[in-house]
Amino acid sequence: MRRRDVVKLAALSAAGLVLPKTVRAAAKQIPVIDTHIHLFDTTRTWGVPWPAKDDLALFKPALPPRYVDLSAKHGVVGAIAIEASPLKSDNDWLLKVVAENPVMVGMIGDLIPGTPSYMADLERLQKNPLFLGIRYGNIWDRDLSIDLDKPGFVDGLKALAKAGLTFDSANPDEKLLAALLKTSEQIPDLRIVVDHLPHAVVPAEATEQKQHFDRLQALAKNPRVFVKLSEIPILVDGTLVTDPSAYTEHLDAIWEIFGEDHILFGSDWPNSDHVAPYDATFSIVQQYISGKSAKAGEKYFWKNSIAAYRWRPRRANQHLASI
């Protein structure tokens, strides 16, 4: 079953995403933390590795003030930047941008475990409390399933775990999910965040589909594994599917496996602009979460991000008690 197969043609109505007043009121009581945004400045004299110049949807500065303009009305009070560059120097660039903008509660950097400078870079970066971990996976032509066997790689991840930092994945497929399961078994005290799980293709063949869900069940047994309900919106024939019910079956399957204590909100802004504007991205997931308890919503939008990333509030409104 491919993810798009979950969307029934009958559900492709152009339903508006207007939340009931009770849901909007409840949402305002929860300080929302967006655990997945990308920051870059396309006006830098030395350029950016991503996005490409011909990417008309993305190639413009994506910096905190622009993000706040889009997200604040939805109750977002903080965000975590996920590095979008393989350049080691961009860890410092991103840390500087994050430090200058208190709406940012931290960042996930880009380092390659096992490389000669990795341990020194990790030791230096972790001294900054805004540095929350690293991202690795299907990005920059990397392959976790192969790299786990390279000298020093696992030791590098063990050092990450010892430092109390988080290991974010990138763009899951079956091969990466298997590698993440292996990682969680080899380093059970490493906090792992599986990003964009709703976007992963569920195999159509019965045996492969069972393996997929068995793998997720095995990952979920580790209490240090979290997943992001990110990259949710989809297009059908070039049109955004706005009916929240079209997403329910797929999201319910993930929710049932991982439970309300291990699922996080992430918008994937501005990469999400390829499919939907921020308002629609947020509204789709908000309507889904509105079917859960208030406690579950609080965990999804706020508390679970603290458990996964150990970020520290920088503003009063990033505390639930202040809302």
Region annotations inferred by a language model:
Residues 36, 94, 160, 227, ...:
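Conserved, mostly hydrophobic/aromatic
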Residues 147-264, 313-323:
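Catalytic pocket-lining loop regions of alpha/beta-barrel enzymes
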Residues 89-103, 247-254, 278-288:
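Short, electropositive alpha-helical surface patch
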Residues 2-19, 30-35, 60-78, 252-253, ...:
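Mid-to-C-terminal alpha-helical segments outside catalytic/metal-binding sites
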Residues 37, 84, 197, 268-269:
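Active-site metal-binding loops of divalent metal-dependent hydrolases
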Residues 51-86, 104-112, 132-139, 165-168:
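Divalent metal-dependent hydrolysis catalytic cores, especially in the metallo-beta-lactamase
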Residues 88-175, 181-182, 228-234, 239-241:
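Active-site gating/metal-coordination segments in enzymes
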